[in-house]
From Swiss-Prot:
Protein name: Macrophage scavenger receptor types I and II
Source organism of this protein record: Oryctolagus cuniculus (Rabbit)
UniProt entry keywords in alphabetical sequence: Coiled coil, Collagen, Disulfide bond, Endocytosis, Glycoprotein, LDL, Membrane, Phosphoprotein, Receptor, Signal-anchor, Transmembrane, Transmembrane helix
Cell location: Membrane
Gene3D superfamilies tied to this protein: SRCR-like domain
Coiled coil: 199-256
Residue positions where Phosphoserine is found in the record: 27
Length: 454
């Protein structure tokens, strides 16, 4: 019973120790300064510390409960052993009172029972010593729990001191987030500005490309006009040479006539013949020196007017001259008034132009009929304006695209045209400025093609 009382005293001590630990934990948590501005991370840390404290208490109770159960079981076994020893003593006394007939057998049995009880008692004593050691160990554990509580209190104090530093770090983090947000907005503004600059640069490049293409067209048109002016200059030089030749022939004829007149004047004799008819009145010459007055002669009668001669025979008709070259195409006239809506009928296609090798009649390699033979067109300076003329001559509304490098396959026969400068207003390709028919500097690998709009 004394042991049981000591055990209950130890249990009360452990309960009081646990209550003191709880009170210390509560007091430590109460010592923490209330700060409504603490962020969620600090609250979560406090919650985690509370959970760790509760787990520590549960661990202490889990260790103490088995120790208490072991002590109670040992005490119950001790009481049962005392009862069994008393019953054995009573049985031995009763057996001695009944008789001593079978003393030897009873003595042997009694000794065996006593030896068994002695061995059991030794085991129980050993077990009690072990339980005492466990109790000593439990006291060490209590001391360890007290030290851990003290350490936990120190940790809570350190946490209370760390709260303002954590708040300062939180404020710094808030400032950093604000600066990051401002940097993000500035980066977005820069991105939008760069995108606008990119769009403007693309627009400027497109405008520059369009202007360059227009300048190329103007240069091409100027080069075509220069070539036409050179051709006109050549024609004028040839005409001037012909006129000079004609003038030389006329001057030679005049010289011959003058020489004939001079020869006839030389052959005139000095014998005075009958007076001829009066000549026409000449121009008034310069006033000469007055000579001596001569003897006045008789006045002759006036002559009669002669008859008009007969008309001579007409000369033979001359040979026809060479046909001149086609003149330069004039500038387009003013735009006419809008005509009435037609019936939608397709224009009659040209009989001198065709498209070969395409997937339909609206596209293919351009071939032209000249001198009864079909030929191709070289793709040098082959542009949309020439394709527009070809498509309109075939009865289509316009041109979709032009093709080079024998896109629809190589043709056969002659290559009639090269570098066809068209204005786009001609009704057929024959009306464009064609320099010459028949090209030798181009091959069928450069045959031109076109795709018309349906």
């Amino acid at each position: 019973m004394a042991q049981w009382d000591s055990f209950t005293d130890q249990q009360e001590d452990t309960d009081s120790c646990s209550e003191s630990v709880k009170f210390d934990a509560r007091s430590n948590t109460a010592l923490l300064p209330p700060n409504p501005k603490n962020g969620p991370p600090l609250q979560e840390k406090l919650k985690s510390f509370k959970a760790a404290l509760i787990a520590l208490y549960l661990l202490v109770f889990a260790v103490l409960i088995p120790i208490i159960a072991i002590m109670a079981a040992q005490l119950l076994k001790w009481e049962m052993k005392n009862c069994t020893v008393g019953s054995i003593n009573a049985n031995s006394v009763s057996s001695s009172l009944l008789g001593r007939g079978n003393d030897s057998e009873h003595e042997v049995r009694f000794r065996e029972v006593v030896m068994e009880h002695i061995s059991k008692m030794e085991k129980r004593i050993q077990y009690i010593s072990d339980t005492e050691e466990n109790l000593v160990d439990s006291e060490h554990f209590q001391n360890f729990s007290v030290t851990t509580d003290q350490r936990f209190a120190d940790v809570l104090l350190q946490l209370s001191t760390l709260v303002p530093t954590v708040q300062g770090h939180g404020n710094a983090v808030d400032e950093i987030t604000r600066s990051l947000i401002s940097l993000n907005t500035t980066l977005l503004d820069l991105h939008l500005y760069v995108e606008t600059l990119n769009v403007k640069f693309q627009e400027n490049t497109l405008k520059g490309q369009e202007e360059i293409s227009k300048l190329k067209e103007r240069v091409h048109n100027a080069s075509a006009e220069i070539m036409s002016m050179k051709e006109e200059q050549v024609h004028l030089e040839q005409e001037i040479k012909r006129e000079v030749k004609v003038l030389n022939n006329i001057t030679n004829d005049l010289r011959l006539k003058d020489w004939e007149h001079s020869q006839t004047l030389r052959n005139i004799t000095l014998i005075q013949g009958p007076p001829g008819p009066p000549g026409e009145k000449g121009d008034r010459g310069p006033t000469g020196e007055s000579g001596p007055p001569g003897v006045p002669g008789p006045v002759g009668p006036p002559g009669l007017k002669g008859d008009r001669g007969s008309i001579g025979f007409p000369g033979s008709r001359g040979y026809p001259g060479q046909s001149g070259k086609t003149g330069r195409t004039g500038y387009p006239g003013p735009k006419g008034q809008k005509g009435e809506k037609g019936s939608g009928s397709i224009l009659t296609p040209s009989a001198t132009v065709r498209l070969v090798g395409g997937r339909g009649p609206h596209e293919g390699r351009v071939e032209i009929l000249h001198n009864g033979q079909w030929g191709t067109v070289c793709d040098d300076h082959w542009e949309l304006r020439a394709g527009q003329v070809v498509c309109r001559s075939l009865g289509y509304r316009g041109v979709k695209s032009v093709h080079k490098k024998a896109y629809f396959g190589q043709g056969t026969g002659p290559i009639w045209l090269n570098e066809v400068p068209c204005l786009g207003m001609e009704s057929s390709i024959e009306e464009c400025k064609i320099r010459q028919w028949g090209v030798r500097v181009c091959s069928h690998g450069e045959d031109a093609g076109v795709t018309c709009t349906l």
